[in-house]
């Protein structure tokens, strides 16, 4: 039996390939992601409002304090998951390709009736939050991958755009053949071709030849034509030569920059404010983002070591520790004394209530035996007789 090794051979996947009908099944997942982002953004908003309320109370700013308290009460009671369908429609289904891919014809109006400024400000900050923007951006990237997978043509186009954007080509104008053998028709064709190419280069390279330079060339050539009687065809050829000499100069060769498809955050990942977007609180939020973060504070042990070197035994944590140990010892001694007092009281009560016991009567046989032993143990009594 011959065994053949299949090392390095990739197994074929038994999963069915993705089809257009599978993409709409992801809609509940997308809405779930949007709902989670809204809940997270509302939590962060409440935390920010709590900090602002504390700062206002410290600075005793009554007007701002009342406004922040109203916003906090609204953020605490309102259910921001009502905006899930609205965000899904406003930021995802606005793309025609995504709408066709998801097979959705949904239209959602703004779901809340906001009458107060505090409500509008809170909703605007949450709908423009970073958490919701990141969730929308992730969903858009997933749908773009589906589009590229289901439409290979789009993948090829995107690859070509990526290659063209990464390269830095330098556009130059082709050489113009101005030989005497060319006919007037060929000259006209070449002239139009070169003019079109120069126009394209001017548009791509940021207008290499300015309008002022064109005017100066035309003026000089028209002046020479009037004085010397030069033909119009030769004038056109001369202008082309001047243009070519200017463009072929190395100092005027400007490399093309990257033509990246830059998408504005407000159009791809952010959220257009359904209410007033020029709110002063939104501007303050943007200013707070640029504040540098402070360094991490020292640990508790490190701070205590510094206090011990600075204050010695008078450090607060040492005093607190000594008082706690003293209170523990006093509590232990008090409980011991209470136990001793209870034990002594119990012994006294037992001795007071105890009745004297009568002597037990022995059995007659034991009584006779006891009496028999008594004389033997008694001391010798009598007179000593001495014999001579």
Swiss-Prot record:
Compositional bias segments (type: Polar residues): 179-205
Superkingdom of origin organism: Eukaryota
Keywords assigned by UniProt, alphabetized: Coiled coil, Nucleus
InterPro entries the UniProt entry points to: Bud22/SRFB1, Bud22_dom
Basic and acidic residues composition-biased segments: 321-350
Cellular localization per UniProt: Nucleus, Nucleolus
Gene Ontology cellular component terms for the protein in this record: 90S preribosome; nucleolus; nucleus
Region listing for Disordered, in residue ranges: 174-206, 318-388
Main subcellular location: nucleus
Family from the record: Belongs to the BUD22 family.
Protein name (Swiss-Prot/TrEMBL): Protein bud22
Source organism (scientific name): Schizosaccharomyces pombe (strain 972 / ATCC 24843)
Native organism taxonomy: Eukaryota, Fungi, Dikarya, Ascomycota, Taphrinomycotina
């Amino acid at each position: 039996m011959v065994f053949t090794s299949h090392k390095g051979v990739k197994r074929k996947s038994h999963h069915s390939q993705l089809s257009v009908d599978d993409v709409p099944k992801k809609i509940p997942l997308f809405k779930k992601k949007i709902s989670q982002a809204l809940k997270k953004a509302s939590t962060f908003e409440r935390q920010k409002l709590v900090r602002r309320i504390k700062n206002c109370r410290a600075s005793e700013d009554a007007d701002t304090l009342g406004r922040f308290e109203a916003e906090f009460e609204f953020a605490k009671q309102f259910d921001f998951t009502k905006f899930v369908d609205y965000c899904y429609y406003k930021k995802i289904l606005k793309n025609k390709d995504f709408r066709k891919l998801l097979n959705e014809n949904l239209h959602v109006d703004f779901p809340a009736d906001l009458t107060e400024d505090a409500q509008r400000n809170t909703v605007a900050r949450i709908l423009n939050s970073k958490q919701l923007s990141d969730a929308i951006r992730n969903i858009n990237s997933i749908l773009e991958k589906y589009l590229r997978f289901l439409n290979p043509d789009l993948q090829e186009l995107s690859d070509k755009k990526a290659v063209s954007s990464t390269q830095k080509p330098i556009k130059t104008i082709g050489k113009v053949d101005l030989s005497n053998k060319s006919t007037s028709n060929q000259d006209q064709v070449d002239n139009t071709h070169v003019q079109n190419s120069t126009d394209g280069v001017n548009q791509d390279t940021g207008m290499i030849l300015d309008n002022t330079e064109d005017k100066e060339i035309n003026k000089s050539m028209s002046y020479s034509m009037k004085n010397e009687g030069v033909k119009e065809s030769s004038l056109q050829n001369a202008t082309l030569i001047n243009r070519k000499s200017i463009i072929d100069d190395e100092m005027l060769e400007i490399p093309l920059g990257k033509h990246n498809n830059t998408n504005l955050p407000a159009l791809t990942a952010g959220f257009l404010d359904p209410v007033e977007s020029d709110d002063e609180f939104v501007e303050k939020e943007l200013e707070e983002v640029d504040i540098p973060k402070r360094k991490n504070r020292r640990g508790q042990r490190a701070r205590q070591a510094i206090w011990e070197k600075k204050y010695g035994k008078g450090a607060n944590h040492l005093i607190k520790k000594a008082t706690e140990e003293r209170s523990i010892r006093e509590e232990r001694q008090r409980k011991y004394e209470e136990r001793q007092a209870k034990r002594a009281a119990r012994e006294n009560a037992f001795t007071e209530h105890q009745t004297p016991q009568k002597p037990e009567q022995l059995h007659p046989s034991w009584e006779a035996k006891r009496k028999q032993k008594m004389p033997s143990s008694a001391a010798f009594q009598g007179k000593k007789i001495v014999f001579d």
